[in-house]
Amino acid sequence: MRRPLFLALLLSLSLCVTTLGEDQPQFPSMPAAVSSNATASLKGGFDLFSMMGVGPKKTWDDVTNQVYVMHLTHSAKWHQGQPVPGVAGRLGASASGAKAQVVLMGGYVVDAQGSEITVPDVNVYVEQRRWNRGKDIPVPVDRAVSGVNHDRFVYLIGGRSKNGPVNNVQVYDVEKDSWSQATPFPGTPVFGLSGGLADDTIVIVDGAKAGPAEGPSYVASDECWMGKIDKKNPEKIEWTKLPAHPGTARFGIAGGGSGRDRKIVFFGGTTTPHDYKGVSYDGKPAEVSSVTFAFDIHHSHWETISDNSPEARLDGGGIQDTVLGPVVIGGMASNRGVTARVTLLPKK
């Protein structure tokens, strides 16, 4: 894109958002509040998607299959997309955009008795704005990390299977509609972890691991890992353990890769693992973090972007990179209320 055209477009985007304070722009809120939703972006962050999740009641019958879409190059307003096929909405699904398609993977369904069932479904939202069915996930998971490499390979990392947390790295080839298994991360199997992918590099942090026999079902993990993807073999990953990241959050952090900045950005989350209602597995109140931090891939170090970011959030469905900066779509606020807000994160 030519520079004058890009600057004009950037200005038009700036005028499409309202202002929060003196210099912090704010995106329009979604038509409905959702948490544990899956989010994705296309066209370099100009098209944003929020899919499924749970509404303000946070009950099994408030789980939705609705899709909300915003085209930043048009009116910069949210509108309803084609709902995700299926008899029930899902929670904790993962999504990524590649080849002008949104790939929606896994998640779990909840019934009236409170049972949670992880599903293998892969749904692909194509340019014609209809859903196609992709090949099922070999190891179905929920609350995993996903990211895209070379606009073709979608990496699904960790998550909770029917047998508990896993350390699998599963790779979906968008061109071939096929799955393969990549080098698993060598750390403790976890779900509710956070991370992203940029510049052939995966960074993942924290999550929940299986708890002790006489304690809560899940406890927090503090492990951080970096994986370098082989340039010739997308299934080969060289993993390295990283030092602890800034902040205290360990579960439900929003994360995502920024190819523009060569960083993986993280925001919010809680100190202890929790369910989709925001209730900790150990029965204690979960403290929501307001820290925004990032891993700088080029310089290979952590950096704190803000110790007191506005609109602290948990279960926000990941971070999407836009031309105005990274955004978090939906989730639960610090009072555990489900929100429709779209928060533009600070940049260092």
Label each PLM-derived region with a short phrase.
Residues 1-7:
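Bacterial N-terminal signal peptides that target proteins for export
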Residues 7-8, 95:
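Intrinsically disordered, low-complexity segments enriched in polar/charged small residues
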Residues 8-16:
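Bacterial N-terminal signal peptides
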Residues 21-348:
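Kelch-like beta-propeller repeat domains
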